[in-house]
Structure formats: structure tokens, C-alpha cells
């Protein structure tokens, strides 16, 4: 399982995206070209791949100029490799969506991240989104391909009383699932970051995750199920093998491929996407470490697949194991 950020570009300004939360950090405006992707993911590499999750930490995959060509390259090698696209869906033309639908098949899934029920409400969080182009693209994916179409909504204060309306819209658009996310990024969880009790986005307590990780609740609309059998079998096998190494109840999900090895739009490889977010500073073993002085930043050139090193060289290098252990 690979998690790829085809593009670090985005047209939206979602307030709780790292782009907006850390305006002092200069975010990359990068993308992966077809030539770069083919150099990194050779046919031998694709022989080992079962799934690609296409989702940026700070960008949207559909804004990579070669995104459709990249999917076509993967599918031409093995049409059963699963492509999971996560997008806000804004600003693409009918022609683009028809091409996207043509290279996709029943093994693929697309998540449209839509929190509203019209342009005005969607813009309350997905600031600068474009409702009509989202709905048009969603309809084409549902009607002109066999891919699994998922409408994904984060529950906020402004939409919690409109969930039935959103469900109706999702069904009308031909979506297979409605996915409701109960987030943690609210004032009651992180008061200093989100204004405590004055957080205007926070919904009723029942729609806030009970843990420190988001919760997802899925409502099936079509009777179809996404085709993930082989990928899930592989994860389950890895889980049972790795579980023996841990005495506690928690098995790191990155070790079984649940998140996937992550390559961002710059070409840098990470153990998983959670480890790719820059931080100002943190304390580790009683020592304060600034991001720019961290082990990873100092050795980033050694784990970059856009350079002269292959993925095999990176993953077999001692520096990778040191990074993973750190």
C-alpha cells in the first residue's frame, strides 16, 4: 500500500488544514509528473503494489497536471491495483471528469470531501470551493464508471442539523456511501488551538470523537461495497504477524500498511503521512528539538525518490531504519 501526494497545490482555504493552521510555514507548490512517477514506480515496483491512496497532506491530487496519465499508467500495468482518490472536487471540467472516469474501474474509490448541502454552506469550511463543479464531477463518476463513489462529510455545528438533507443529496448524486467523520479538531479537545468553548465550528458533543483520533461512521446508500478484499487480507496477515512483537493492545497501523508508505509531492518518503507534518519544536527525551534541526530534515535528501536514489535503495539504507525508529 502506497500513499501518494500527487500535488501539494490546493484551491481551498479550509481553516483546520495545516496550510491555514501554520501560515508561517512556506508550503510547497509541487506536483509529481508522469515521468517522475514512472521513474519511481517501475513495473517491478507496480508488481508489488496492491493499492495507491492518492491524497495530499496539504494538497489535492486532482490538481496535478498528469494525474489522469498517472492512473492510466498504473491501470495499464495492472487494472486490479486499487486507486483511492481523496479530493474536494472543485474546478475541474466535464471533459476532465470524463477522462478520469474512463481510466477508473470497479477496483477504485473516490472520496468527495463535501461538508455542505449547497454552495453557501460548503464554503463555511471548504472555503473557496465550487459547488456546481463538485456535483457535476460526482455525477459523472457515479454514472460513467464502475468506481465506488463516497460522499465524505465532517460533522460541524453548521451542518449537524442537515445530515438527512446531505444523505438525500448523496443518494441523488448516485453515491455508494455517505461517510460521516466525527473530528477531534475542536475547542473542547484542543482549547488553546481552537478557542475552547468559543469554537464556532464545534458540533454537539455526540458528533465529536470520543478519543484523540477521528471516528468514521459509514451509511451505505447503494447496496454496493468497495472492492478491497486482497488489500484487507494482506493487512490482516501482517497484523497477525506483527502483533506477536508487541505486548500492549496497540499495533502501529503503519507497520501493517493501513496508512501506507507515504511519498509527498516533493518526492520525500515517510513511514506514513502522520510523520510528514512540520512542527516548530517538540520535546523528546528531555531535549527540545526544532523542526529544522531534526534528524529527518538534516537527512531528507537521502530519502527523496525524485533524486538519484531508487525506492529500493532508500528502504534498504540504514538511514531509513534510523528514521523509522526515531
Q: Which sequence ranges carry the predicted segments?
A:
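Short, hydrophobic secondary-structure boundary micro-motifs
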Residues: 26, 53, 151, 323-324
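Radical SAM enzyme [4Fe-4S]-AdoMet core and its adjacent flexible, acidic
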Residues: 5, 20-32, 47, 68, ...
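Cysteine/selenocysteine-centered motifs that mediate thiol-based redox chemistry or coordinate metal-sulfur cofactors
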Residues: 301-326
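Non-transmembrane alpha-helical segments in soluble domains
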Residues: 41, 71, 75, 167, ...
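Short cysteine clusters
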Residues: 10, 14-17, 254, 272, ...
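Conserved alpha-helical substructure of the radical SAM core
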Residues: 1-109, 124, 132
Amino acid at each position: 500500500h502506497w500513499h501518494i501526494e500527487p500535488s501539494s497545490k490546493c484551491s481551498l482555504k479550509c481553516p483546520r488544514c495545516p496550510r491555514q493552521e501554520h501560515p508561517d510555514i512556506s508550503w510547497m507548490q509541487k506536483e509529481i509528473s508522469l515521468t517522475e512517477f514512472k521513474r519511481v514506480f517501475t513495473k517491478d515496483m507496480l508488481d508489488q503494489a496492491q493499492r495507491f491512496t492518492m491524497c495530499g497532506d496539504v494538497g489535492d491530487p486532482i490538481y496535478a497536471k498528469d494525474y489522469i496519465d498517472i492512473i492510466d499508467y498504473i491501470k495499464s500495468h495492472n487494472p486490479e491495483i486499487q486507486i483511492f482518490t481523496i479530493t474536494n472536487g472543485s474546478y475541474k471540467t466535464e471533459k476532465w471528469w470524463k477522462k478520469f472516469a474512463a481510466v477508473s474501474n470497479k477496483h477504485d474509490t473516490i472520496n468527495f470531501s463535501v461538508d455542505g448541502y449547497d454552495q453557501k454552506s460548503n464554503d463555511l469550511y471548504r472555503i473557496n470551493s465550487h459547488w456546481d463543479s463538485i456535483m457535476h464531477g460526482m455525477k459523472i463518476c457515479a454514472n460513467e464508471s464502475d468506481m465506488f463513489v463516497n460522499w465524505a462529510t465532517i460533522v460541524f455545528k453548521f451542518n449537524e442539523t442537515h445530515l438527512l438533507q446531505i444523505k438525500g443529496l448523496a443518494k441523488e448524486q448516485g453515491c455508494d456511501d455517505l461517510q460521516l467523520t466525527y473530528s477531534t479538531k475542536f475547542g473542547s479537545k484542543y482549547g488553546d488551538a481552537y478557542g475552547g468553548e468559543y469554537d464556532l465550528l464545534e458540533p454537539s458533543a455526540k458528533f465529536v470523537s470520543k478519543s484523540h483520533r477521528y471516528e468514521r461512521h459509514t451509511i451505505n446508500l447503494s447496496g454496493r461495497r468497495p472492492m478491497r478484499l486482497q488489500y484487507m487480507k494482506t493487512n490482516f496477515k501482517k497484523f497477525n504477524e506483527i502483533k506477536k512483537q508487541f505486548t500492549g493492545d496497540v499495533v502501529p497501523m503503519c507497520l501493517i500498511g493501513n496508512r501506507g508508505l507515504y511519498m509527498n509531492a516533493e518526492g520525500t518518503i515517510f513511514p506514513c503521512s502522520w510523520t510528514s507534518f512540520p512542527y516548530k519544536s517538540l520535546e523528546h527525551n528531555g531535549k527540545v528539538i526544532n523542526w529544522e534541526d531534526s534528524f529527518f530534515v538534516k537527512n531528507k535528501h537521502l530519502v527523496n525518490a525524485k533524486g538519484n536514489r531508487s525506492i529500493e535503495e532508500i528502504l534498504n539504507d540504514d538511514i531509513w531504519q534510523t528514521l523509522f525508529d526515531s
